[in-house]
Swiss-Prot record:
Gene: eno
Binding sites annotated in the UniProt record for Mg(2+): D241, E282, D309
Cofactor: Mg(2+)
Protein's UniProt name: Enolase
Function description: Catalyzes the reversible conversion of 2-phosphoglycerate (2-PG) into phosphoenolpyruvate (PEP). It is essential for the degradation of carbohydrates via glycolysis.
Family affiliation: Belongs to the enolase family.
Active site: E204, K334
Record's keyword annotation contains RNA-binding: no
SS bonds (residue pairs): none
Gene3D superfamilies: Enolase-like C-terminal domain, Enolase-like, N-terminal domain
Keywords (A to Z) from UniProt: Cytoplasm, Glycolysis, Lyase, Magnesium, Metal-binding, Secreted
GO annotation, cellular component aspect: cell surface; extracellular region; phosphopyruvate hydratase complex
Pathway: Carbohydrate degradation; glycolysis; pyruvate from D-glyceraldehyde 3-phosphate: step 4/5
SUPFAM superfamilies: Enolase C-terminal domain-like, Enolase N-terminal domain-like
Species for this entry: Micrococcus luteus (strain ATCC 4698 / DSM 20030 / JCM 1464 / CCM 169 / CCUG 5858 / IAM 1056 / NBRC 3333 / NCIMB 9278 / NCTC 2665 / VKM Ac-2230)
């Protein structure tokens, strides 16, 4: 079994032009693993700490040279360890850090090493990464939750909801799902142009026009679905990322120009689900509004997927609380929220044991790294959120999923409508 021979890190740029950490791990058999760490725009209060330099003279204080230096310290600890023993590798880094939120070394340093070790070990095993991570039963291709219209923190517009997504639930394969979603994306551009609206792009490749309301965004997408030749609700469903913590303050939500309670937000979402084929709502309420989440889950949880992103931050302790209190029914998985691969697997395992679906997710600040595509298939998650079919940092993940589907051949199963509560029975 190959041992870790050397670890090297560098500062590179992400899709927003901000620095991030890239790590390379070399094994004694010559295998090389490389991984780059993503970064979010709307971040949960309880996420693991991303280490930035704070030197305003470099990249406005967003440099990551300190995190790069931290990797050099990690290297001294890990050289000579078995690359295939991922849990021991990650535990050694957590012990070296010694803080509950990875604040000493930085989650971006630890995660970069964690991912690169796995990539190197997969190469040493002569396996594609998804097979190495998930084993012989990894075969489910995820529904691409394609963010084609942006608002909130991902765009400069007056739309409160951060992401409006399409989900090609009726497609027979991932390849066809990607085609369907891409055709709707192009149709949406035409619809926007015909109405004299902006076709500028947000952080994740979706369009970011200035619209009068959130419903107007949904209606535009519905028009685009029809224009592309698909049936709304049968072929293509809708999904939202509200990112409500961004407009929650002092117990209320500033939404569409009004102050609303959690109960009023729940009534609003119920009306949307009644009128649109929405299969998933992410972060509909604030990360600390546990009572509101319980109320919303009781009211809507059997009809729609209620996804905890800022609520759970891929953290087993917060997820366990959600399970116990019946707050939410699905987990958004972001590897950099928790900061190591094994802790990510622990969160996914806990969710799946309790019938919570998992949606593997990118961040708004991405790179050409395709790790999460393999992770989605390795865990049979059934859903992936990695932006619009535009910009190479987003498309890279979709292209990797095409390769994986081709590798699986007849064993590949596309999750489709079975991934969502709205269509179960």
């Amino acid at each position: 079994m190959a041992l870790i021979d050397a670890i090297h890190a560098r500062e590179i740029l992400d899709s927003r032009g901000n620095p991030t950490v890239e790590v390379e791990v070399l094994l004694t058999d010559g295998s090389l693993g490389r991984a780059a760490v993503p970064s979010g725009a709307s971040t949960g209060e309880f996420e693991a700490v991303e280490r930035r330099d704070g030197d305003k003279k470099r990249y406005g204080g967003k440099g990551v040279l300190d995190a790069v230096a931290a990797v050099e310290g990690i290297a001294e600890e890990l050289e000579g360890e078995f690359a295939a023993d991922q849990r021991a590798v990650d535990r050694a880094m957590r012990d070296l850090d010694g803080t509950p939120n990875k604040g000493k070394l930085g989650a971006n340093a630890i995660l970069g090493v964690s991912m690169a070790v796995a990539v190197a070990a997969a190469q040493a095993s002569d396996l594609m990464l998804y097979k190495y991570l998930g084993g012989p039963n990894s075969h489910v291709l995820p529904v691409p939750m394609m963010n084609i219209l942006n608002g909130g923190a991902h765009a400069d517009s007056n739309v409160d909801i951060q992401e409006f997504m399409i989900a090609p639930i009726g497609a027979p394969s991932f390849r066809e799902a990607l085609r369907w979603g891409t055709e709707v994306y192009h149709a949406l551009k035409t619809v926007l142009q015909e109405k004299g609206l902006s076709t500028g792009l947000g952080d994740e490749g979706g369009f970011a026009p200035s619209l009068e309301s959130n419903r107007a965004a949904l209606d535009l997408i519905a028009e685009a679905v029809t224009k592309a030749g698909y049936r709304l609700g049968e072929d293509i469903a809708l999904a939202l990322d509200v990112a409500s913590s961004e407009f929650f303050d002092k117990g209320s939500y500033t939404f569409e120009g009004q102050q609303r309670s959690a109960e009023e937000m729940a009534a609003y979402y119920t009306e949307l689900v009644d009128n649109y084929p929405i299969v998933s709502i992410e972060d509909p309420l604030d990360e600390d509004d546990w009572e509101g989440w319980q109320h919303l889950t009781a009211q809507l949880g059997d009809r729609v997927q209620l996804v905890g992103d800022d609520l759970f931050v891929t953290n087993v302790e917060r997820l366990q609380r959600g399970i116990d209190e019946k707050a939410g029914n699905a987990l958004l998985v972001k590897v950099n929220q928790i900061g190591s691969l094994t802790e990510t697997f622990d969160a996914i395992s806990l969710a799946q044991r309790h019938m919570f679906h998992c949606m593997i997710s990118h961040r708004s600040g991405e790179t050409e790294d395709t790790f999460i595509a393999d992770l989605a298939v390795a865990t049979n998650a059934g859903q992936i959120k990695t932006g619009a079919p535009a910009r190479s940092d987003r498309v890279a993940k979709y292209n990797q999923l095409l390769r994986i589907e081709e590798d699986l051949a007849d064993a590949a199963v596309y999750a489709g409508r079975s991934a969502f509560p709205r269509f179960r029975g």
